[in-house]
Structure formats: C-alpha cells, structure tokens
C-alpha cells in the first residue's frame, strides 16, 4: 500500500512516517508492505522551517503552535486476498448494483432541472446518490462536472481479472457518449473489498491509460472549488500549481442559480487525482467550432481504440469503452496484480473548457461486467 499526502505552500518541509512509534520513512510518500495481520497505527508528520507554514493535507490534521502538522490513522491488514471475493453466479447481474458516492465538480449540468434531470431536492449526499442511481437505471447520463468530479459504483459480485474477458481480456465496460471530436475523458480506478465490509473504503488503484506516466500528465493534481456568493455567478477555482480559473456560468443554456453541487455544505471543497493534458481547441479560429480531441485508450467517455467498435456515434448516443483490470497500478506505478475487484470509480480527467460549450465533463450511463456480458 502506497500512502501519499498533498502539501501546499510548504517552504522547506521535512517528513516523518512512523508505525507503532517506530520511524519507517522520511519522504512525502511511503510504501507500506505489511508482514503480519492486525491493526497498525501510522502517523505522518510534516515539519516546516518557517514561522508561519501554510499547508493543506488531504485528510484531517492536528496543528500545533509550532511549524508542525500531523496525520494519524490506522491500517487493518488481512491475510488472504481471496477471503472476501464474491464469485459471480447464474443469479449475478452483469450491470452495476449500487452507487456509493456521487461527488461531481461544479458544472453546467449540476443542479440543472431540464437536461440534467435534477429535481431541486438533491440537498444531501444521499439524495445525490439516489439521483445518480435513478438516472443510470434509465440508461441516462450522469455528469461528473469539471475536473476531479467522480462517481463510485459497485456490483453484486466481484469482477474477476480474467483473460477470458471480452475480446482478449476486457473485464468491464463504462458507457459514455463520446464521438469523433468530442471526448471528455474520465480516469478510472478500481478497488477490492479487502476488509470485507462491503463498502468502498479500501485502497484505490488507477487503471493506467495511454497518458499514464507522460511528462505532460500531472499525477498529483488538486483543485479547490469555491461556492459563488450570488446566483448566476461563475464558480471560481484554484489548483495546487498556483493556477486560478473558473467554471463559466452559461445563462443562455443552463440558468439554474448555481453550478456548485447543492448537497455540498461547505463553502469550498478540494478534489484530488491525475490531470491529463487537454486536447481541446478552437478549430474554427473564431470560437464557433470547438473540438475535444480523443486519447488513444484507457479512459471513460473517450473516443479511443478501446471502444472496440467502428461506429462513429455521430448522434452522441450511449457507447461503451472497455477496460482490463490487469492495467491497475499502485501509487508508485507498479502493477497491482489484482485477482478481482468490487468497486469502480470514474473521475473527470481534464481541466479544460471549450468556449460556448463550457467545461469538459465526463458523462457516464452505466457500468457492465463484460466477463459475464461479453459485449452484448
């Protein structure tokens, strides 16, 4: 298991990782390889040399009057990888079973009552999940908003990392609506239910795609979105590269009061993950015709070669992209070698906007176990 925090604005930070009181690492990230079962207490400490360090950690912190911040958590180690595997049976459904979380970034379809399908009553995380479930049960798209927005789903069984998957080992698919010139790539993650509690609270593994490891891909990216102070306003954001921007309010197309998710109670929230280099450009040169270019493979809602279809999807209908569990990697980029998965997460992978078309936002219609479905 690889653990890594995000530090913003530290001048000269020094890091310390301890397990049960013993220091085991001094870098920003630490790879923990358990040697026994049981619960371990892990403490991460950041010490900065300035009088007033400014830093943000990706989890709750305890801050002293000194230049120090600590993060403390526990890890429960289990023995057999197969111990919580849920084999598929004749009664298993090939499609997703449940939405566990729906946390989009702000976007033109968020809170939108017409094409977005919101009712105006989605004011809690539970209501947002119910909205996403209802949409996908009808094979209708759910928008993840701008960069970093995500959805988490599970199945009524474990999906095997099987070489007998569809067309040479594709184990599952995610349905989007990409077509030539309109790709809004979503980065895909998978998880095993390692602790057996049927919840997606174990370790996520990214499925590497064609852009993984490239210099222009920012692997440790983060964006903070800020709630607008009045109706009809743009949503301001700031990333961990020092860049500021906004999700444009497009009144002529989507005039709901706010594009900031109504069920997020805080005045700002931060999303984390990789960011792909945008391939959005103005082909017309005058702002009238924008293109969202595709990526080779490995992303949801993308017109790549893993569509396994010659259909150009000119009508922007529902279209599958196929994925292999064998492409899962850990935080260090090493193969995860998962035998099966239980949960899937998709996250909008680019921070870009296309003029009057608005922000790039991944859309998903559904998730399918292709070991069972075989491309049907």
Name these PLM-found stretches.
Residues 1-5:
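Conserved small/polar residues in nucleotide/adenosyl-binding loops
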Residues 8-16:
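Solvent-exposed loop segments of extracellular immunoglobulin-like
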Residues 12, 37-41, 338-343:
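Extracellular Ig-like/FN3 beta-sandwich strand-entry sites
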Residues 16-33:
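Surface-exposed, flexible coil segments in extracellular/virion-facing regions
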Residues 74-184, 208-376:
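A domain-level signal for the mature, folded cores of soluble proteins
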Residues 167, 194-203:
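Acidic, glycine-anchored loop motifs typical of Ca2+
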């Amino acid at each position: 298991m690889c653990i890594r925090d995000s530090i913003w604005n530290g001048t000269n930070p020094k890091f310390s990782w301890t397990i049960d009181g013993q220091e085991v690492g001094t870098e920003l990230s630490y790879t923990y390889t358990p040697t026994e079962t049981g619960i371990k207490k892990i403490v991460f400490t950041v010490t900065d040399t300035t009088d007033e360090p400014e830093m943000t950690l990706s989890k709750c912190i305890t801050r002293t009057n000194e230049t120090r911040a600590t993060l403390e958590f526990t890890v429960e180690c289990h023995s057999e990888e197969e111990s919580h595997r849920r084999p598929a049976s004749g009664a298993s459904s090939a499609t997703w079973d449940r939405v566990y979380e729906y946390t989009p970034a702000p976007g033109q379809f968020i809170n939108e009552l017409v094409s977005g399908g919101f009712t105006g009553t989605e004011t809690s995380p539970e209501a947002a999940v119910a909205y996403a479930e209802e949409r996908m049960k009808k094979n209708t798209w759910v928008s993840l908003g701008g960069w970093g927005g995500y959805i988490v789903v599970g199945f009524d069984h474990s999906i095997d990392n099987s070489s007998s998957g569809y067309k040479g080992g594709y184990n599952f698919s995610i349905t989007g609506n990409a077509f030539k010139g309109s790709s809004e790539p979503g980065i895909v993650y998978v998880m095993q239910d390692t602790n057996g509690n049927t919840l997606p609270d174990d370790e996520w593994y990214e499925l590497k795609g064609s852009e993984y490891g490239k210099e222009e891909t920012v692997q440790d990216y983060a964006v903070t979105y800020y709630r607008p102070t009045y109706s009809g306003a743009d949503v301001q954001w700031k990333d961990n590269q020092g860049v500021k921007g906004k999700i444009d309010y497009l009144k002529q197309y989507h005039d709901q009061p706010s594009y900031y998710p109504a069920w997020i109670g805080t005045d700002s929230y931060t999303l984390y993950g990789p960011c792909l280099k945008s391939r959005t450009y103005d082909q017309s040169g005058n702002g009238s015709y924008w293109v969202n270019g595709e990526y080779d493979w490995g992303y949801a809602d993308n017109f790549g070669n893993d569509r396994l279809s010659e259909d150009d999807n000119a009508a922007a209908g529902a279209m599958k992209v196929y994925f292999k569990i064998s492409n899962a990697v850990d935080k260090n980029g090493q193969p995860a070698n998962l035998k099966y998965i239980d949960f899937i997460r998709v996250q909008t992978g680019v921070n870009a906007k296309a003029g009057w078309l608005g922000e790039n936002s991944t859309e998903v219609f559904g998730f399918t176990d292709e070991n069972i479905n075989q491309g049907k």
